[in-house]
Design a protein with these regions (language model features):
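Substrate-binding pocket helix/loop in short-chain dehydrogenase/reductase
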Residues: 101-102, 109-114, 211
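Conserved glycine-rich cofactor-binding loop
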Residues: 11, 18-20
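A glycine/serine/threonine-rich, flexible loop-to-helix segment
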Residues: 3, 55, 178, 190-217
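Active-site helix of classical SDR
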Residues: 125, 161, 169
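Alpha-helical segment proximal to the catalytic Tyr-Lys
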Residues: 130, 174-178
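Active-site loop immediately N-terminal to the catalytic Tyr-X3-Lys motif
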Residues: 100-103, 150-156, 178-179
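Residue(s) in the substrate-gating loop at a strand-loop-helix junction
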Residues: 145
């Protein structure tokens, strides 16, 4: 992959980047010259990620951290500044999805998705912004999903969280643009990752709803 920009000298934290979209984003940033830092919730996932980065020729730094836990996030951000350097770029990539019809979903399951997909980006962004303000620059990228704009059966919690993340993105721009902090949201479509495996299996025979029934759009 060729890149036409440079991230030399920049430290990029990509949350949940042991595999999948996060790993691909971090790998692309590394090729542009960034120093890559990532986290995952379990040591085994961090180790798996470190091995994958090493195989790709990338010298990444991995940390075990639950991004829904504010104390752990603050400690991780402080440790990254000590071990590597302050964070210049944050990619809020970590996320989960529960494919359950809304009326079958428990309130606890709904809250868990909101916690990981919306509260965690708030917590991590809040942790890195003060240092960005001090240094006069910063970049935050939120992985919002096309579900921040569209609805679909069985993903009520995920769509609600990603819709909230889209508005959090806009609010960060409004509050912190004056400090030369940019915040953007990206809405990927369906990408072949472990998270979308159940959907691909369900549609493997090619049978699916017609598009106009499959997705509810704004009218």
């Amino acid at each position: 992959m060729s890149v036409n920009f440079s991230l030399e000298g920049k430290v990029a934290l990509v949350t949940g980047a042991s595999y999948g979209i996060g790993f691909a984003i971090a790998s692309g940033m590394a090729k542009a010259g960034a120093t890559i830092v990532f986290n995952d919730i379990k040591q085994e996932l961090v180790d798996k990620g470190l091995a994958a980065y090493k195989e790709a020729g990338i010298d990444a730094h991995g940390y075990v951290c639950d991004v829904t836990n504010e104390e752990q996030v603050n400690a991780m951000v402080a440790q990254i500044a000590k071990d590597v350097a302050p964070i210049d770029i944050l990619v809020n990539n970590a996320g989960i999805i529960k494919r359950i019809p809304m009326c079958d979903m428990t309130a606890a399951e709904f809250r868990q998705v909101i916690d990981v997909d919306l509260n965690a980006p708030f917590i991590v962004s809040k942790a890195v912004i003060p240092s960005m303000i001090e240094r006069g620059h910063g970049k935050i990228i939120n992985i919002c999903s096309m579900m921040s704009e569209l609805g679909r059966e069985t993903v009520s919690a995920y769509a609600a969280a990603k819709g909230g993340l889209k508005m959090l993105t806009r609010n960060i721009c409004s509050e912190y643009g004056q400090y030369n902090i940019q915040c953007n949201g990206i809405g990927p479509g369906y990408i072949e990752t472990p998270q979308t495996a159940p959907l691909r299996e369900r549609q493997a025979d090619g049978s699916r709803h017609p598009f106009d029934q499959f997705i509810c759009t704004k009218t």
